[in-house]
Amino acid sequence: MKGFVGDIEKLTEDNDDFRRVLYTGHSLQLVLMAIPPGEEIGEEVHDDRDQFFRIEGGKGEVWIDGVCTTVKADDGIIVPQGARHNVVSTGSEPLRLYTIYGPPEHIDGTVHATSAEASAAHEHFDGKTTE
């Protein structure tokens, strides 16, 4: 199959991994995330890529350049390149979301079960796509 077709809402809601790369193209990448209550992705800046988040479940806060916004299911967020940002899970259930990087950020097929595992990994997109 070319491209990616799937029930992204169900896939996101069923995902228990902190990070799971679903599809990597030349210019964008689709990643599922489940952030446990009280945890966060960690403050970061992408100098060379934009990032889109779609919240499918849970509650949280998104910080973009020092501005905090409360988020919940059905919210969408765009973080422009160069913006310092963080996503924090503030509810009693995991914050479940998918994110789209443009261009890709992670190695295709990456799965990190926990945030600790993700923090320990230092690999970045190596140019290899899903197809």
What is the role of each PLM region?
Residues A34-P36, V45-V62, I100:
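Short, conserved beta-strand element in jelly-roll/cupin
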